[in-house]
């Protein structure tokens, strides 16, 4: 017997026939319909969850001045909240990766959303920097769990057809990050607190009786009620989503039936760990360059190129705008192109654009064009990398956590190092050198990764993988039999 996709179907049908010989066709059709419905339901909910994560993560930017004022600190002296959130994300990625392999996926993601909602609800009430940092760490942990679990769950649901869905997942995050500043300014008006004292003063006078020692308290109602509504509305959205994530967990057969995609057997590259380490480095350099350029392009344009602040802000917007737009387009390209092809195209685009940025670092026109191309080139790299490695080796929760830790370390280390070096060499375009260096390294790393991934397996390794696939199929068949 051959234990592949068609083999799995044959085993399941044989079991169903032995149980109810007269009804196997109708039951199989009904089961397939329920499975497809649950798969699409889960995919939609995960996209909504990543949208919420994008809004939750990005709302910190436009509300940062209000949060600093809330804890009586200057903006420049409150940078520890970013470190706290990043460390929380690291911890959440590791813990989530371990837990994702040993507990129900939906239960874990639902609990992480409850944690996010709690952190968002409490954030505007924080009156000390230490407590605010703790809240940011809590939301960071939940982000790490969701990022790790969401990617693995999509691959479990869709298998080899998961590339467009991975792209959609990361587009949802980018869309949320794009919408957050607009919602914060237009809908909630969080930065207008200094100009509108009437309503907050009335609220304070009514609430001061309950918070007489507000200056010494750890938690208190914020002076700016717009800040409260901003975080409360996002927290409510996340809380509602947690209900939809818990729903499949409580569904009778959700724990018993695995998707057909995940029942096709485990894949494992010959040098599985080496491949994960290479992808760890790849994401370290890629994410570091992406965040570094997005964080410093405004200051680089004003100090090095001599742009006006309004022009520099537009340049920053064009980078993130093309980034978000091309993540959306990548959903459709992923249905036509292999993940490896998309990664090659992204590497070529980022290498060419960063090279021209370094070559013509004083040219505003080149800066506009190359920034657009650079943003577009970086957009599909991360989700394509996740889809690509799944073609050669099965991505478990621990594996996903490992490579996401590489991305998180790059996010923290590269911008910090770039800022330090730029301070030491103010006349050099250090930021552009870092981006070019990262582009060169990722372009070199990918062929090495491809070579390692495609090395043929030994006979002993093939037997081990076939045995593992057989166990998965027999386990899946037993569960279907029990469910019936």
From Swiss-Prot:
This is Sodium-dependent glucose transporter 1. Expressed in brain, liver, lung, and kidney. In kidney expressed in cortex and inner medulla, in ascending thin limbs (ATLs) and lower descending thin limbs (DTLs). Primarily expressed in the proximal tubules of the kidney. Belongs to the major facilitator superfamily. Keywords: Cell membrane, Ion transport, Membrane, Phosphoprotein, Sodium, Sodium transport, Sugar transport, Symport, Transmembrane, Transmembrane helix, Transport. One of its GO terms (cellular component) is apical plasma membrane. It comes from Rattus norvegicus (Rat). It is a multi-pass membrane protein. The keyword Protein transport does not apply. It comes from the Eukaryota. The modification Phosphoserine is found at residue 6. It is found in: Apical cell membrane. GO terms for biological process: D-glucose import across plasma membrane; sodium ion transport. May function as a sodium-dependent glucose transporter. Potential channels for urea in the inner medulla of kidney. CDD domains: MFS_NaGLT1_MFSD4B. InterPro entries: MFS_trans_sf. The chain crosses the membrane at residues 40-60, 80-100, 106-126, 135-155, 168-188, 227-247, 274-294, 317-337, 340-360, 366-386, 401-421, 428-448. Its main location: membrane. Induction: After water restriction, up-regulated in inner medulla ascending thin limbs (ATLs) and lower descending thin limbs. The keyword Translocase does not apply. One of its GO terms (molecular function) is symporter activity.
